């Protein structure tokens, strides 16, 4: 579990597999006139699955509270931290480890930088931008190879539209067996709209739908 100091909200990993090498990576930005808002650190942990190792990066990026455009700079910084850490793994010789990046990115998948993969027949890739020109290509289960969505239902319903701000991104030898939002009651209503928790009625769960993704490594 990782959370900012003096905060009751953080990120956590529950696992049936052995975990090791937990590290956290925090922002410390002092180049803007605006003071850096409180943010959750990036979690990095290794999962041991049989004879294989999988690196997991858990994210919860800055919300759009305060304005989407006004807060985008902080999500850009968090994107940079993630891209740099993945890039560092390749430099350190861990390029064979499959990598899963997941969490609430507060940025819908189509709003990331998208481009065709560097190899033929790879389809659309989500590109994470680091510093000094570092670019990390990843695969999103939200997207088909032609860039269209794999599901009609997103993870967050806002202003009458589905958003896909909760994400999985994959690198390495990973096959997606199944993926989608979990819409069973009491998580969602009959239209699959998430039922956020109501403190007055003590009902509902979350304004985000959980994602279920089965992968083969």
What residue ranges belong to the model's regions?
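Second-shell loop/turn segments in exported
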Residues: 31-32, 66-75, 153-156, 199-200
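Structured beta-strand-rich core segments of catalytic domains in phosphoester-bond hydrolases
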Residues: 2-53, 57-61
């Amino acid at each position: 579990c990782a959370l900012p100091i003096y905060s009751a909200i953080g990120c956590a990993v529950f696992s049936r597999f052995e975990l090791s090498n937990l590290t956290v990576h925090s922002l410390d930005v002092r180049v803007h006139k605006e003071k850096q808002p409180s943010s959750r650190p990036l979690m990095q942990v290794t999962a041991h699955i049989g004879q294989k190792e999988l690196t997991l990066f858990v994210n919860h990026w800055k919300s759009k509270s305060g304005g989407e455009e006004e807060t985008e700079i902080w999500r850009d910084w968090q994107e940079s931290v993630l891209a740099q850490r993945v890039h560092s793994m390749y430099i350190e010789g861990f390029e064979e480890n499959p990598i899963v990046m997941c969490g609430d990115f507060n940025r819908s998948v189509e709003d990331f930088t998208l481009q065709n993969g560097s190899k033929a027949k790879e389809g659309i890739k989500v590109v994470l931008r680091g510093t000094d020109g570092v670019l990390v290509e990843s695969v999103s289960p939200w997207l088909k190879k032609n860039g269209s969505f794999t599901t009609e239902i997103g993870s967050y319903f806002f202003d009458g539209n589905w958003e896909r701000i909760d994400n999985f991104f994959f690198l390495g030898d990973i096959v997606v067996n199944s993926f989608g939002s979990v819409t069973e009651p009491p998580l969602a209503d009959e239209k699959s709209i998430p039922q956020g928790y109501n403190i007055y009625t003590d009902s509902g769960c979350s304004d985000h739908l959980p994602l279920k993704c089965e992968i083969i490594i």
